């Protein structure tokens, strides 16, 4: 499935259904090869180069006036700065930040350590916990924050 295919599917779902919250956890792919080959690339060449083109940014292009848009930012440095830039550039209501280089968090782990930011300035840290408990805490926090507006 390509990023364009995914974008079309999401747009169709948003036309047919109303969602309170839209969580977009990760990009399908940020880049795709410029040229595709249906043939096997032979291994006789020691090195090859691929030219990559940026794919459609699905999250940035979702337009839903009735749904909260919530994105994720996986960073290795300058996390808060980069997450807040993404919050603004993609017109999100909330962004959830985690670090790829943090031990016992993120990929290959059942636990995570997160930060939640809102477009209104909310900043909340969620200490290391199971991903299941964190997901419940995130939803509760977002609902509470929305009710307090």
Summary of predicted features, one role per range:
Residues 1-74, 78-149:
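A cross-family phosphate/adenosyl-ligand binding-site feature
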């Amino acid at each position: 499935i390509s990023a364009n295919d995914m974008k079309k599917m999401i747009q169709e779902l948003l036309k047919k259904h109303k969602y309170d919250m839209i969580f977009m956890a990760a990009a399908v792919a940020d880049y795709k090869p410029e040229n595709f080959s249906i043939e096997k690339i032979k291994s006789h060449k020691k090195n090859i180069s691929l030219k990559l083109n940026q794919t459609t940014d699905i999250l940035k292009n979702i337009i839903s006036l009735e749904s909260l848009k919530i994105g994720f930012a996986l960073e290795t440095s300058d996390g808060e700065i980069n997450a807040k830039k993404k919050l603004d550039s993609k017109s999100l209501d909330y962004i959830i930040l985690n670090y790829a280089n943090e031990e016992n968090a993120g990929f290959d782990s059942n636990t995570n350590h997160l930060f939640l930011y809102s477009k209104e300035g909310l900043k909340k840290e969620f200490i290391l916990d199971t991903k299941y408990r964190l997901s419940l805490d995130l939803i509760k926090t977002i609902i509470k924050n929305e009710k307090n507006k």
